[in-house]
Amino acid sequence: MGMGERVSATGLCAALYAIGSFLTSYLVSPFGRGQFRPAVVLPAIFSIVYGPGVGGLGAAIGTVIADSMKHGSLYLPSLLAAAPGNFIGFYILGKLTRRDFNWRKFSIASQISLWIGCATVAYLYTIVISLLGMLPPSLTPEDLFMLGTSLTLWFFITEYPFVILLVPPILRALKFRGELKGGPSWLISLAIPGAIFLTISLMITFTPASSEILRGLIVKLNPSYALSTLQLIQLLFAGSGAAMTIVGLLLQVRGA
């Protein structure tokens, strides 16, 4: 693919991702930070079809545009945190799926790239907004680490199902390298990640140490709604984990 085509594809990716991200930008995590963003499907497709550079750069530009549109001016946390994380995540996805594209590779690559990308965004974002004075000064380094970890989990759990369920049929519709080689392993794709989230749900619900640490962070961030926020987080992990596990097992049995 020539330079002109790469530039055009990158611009299209950025524009579509910006529009898709802006449409859900007001749906945020229970912490009041971090957006619900199913639009990650778009740069994922561009990374696989046009290469890691196109998807990564398009995602970085698109997220800055979307966040800046929401806030009415250039949004520094997006430029300094979301852009690098988006670029790294989708660049890795494109790199890992460049050759011998198959279901197993796509599933594993999606999980690896999203975990790395989500963690990069979350921890950088936490550091940046703390330095900019956008968080309560009472937050300790441990609180900031917990917030970064919680946002990482939020990003992944609200983005991964869309990638794993929507990207393959879209690639088929685009006739990208023919059909995906091999059948989908829904155990690897959905059931195992779902079981992990169920485990996290049990930990933050029934383990006193974990629940108290999380409760302490929530009280500092939003004291008026601390209990309801904690319950919402527990429900999010339990519901998402159960749904992913059950759907993964059913699809695996059906395809067997």
Task: Name each model feature, range by range.
Residues 1-256:
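Loop-helix junctions at membrane interfaces
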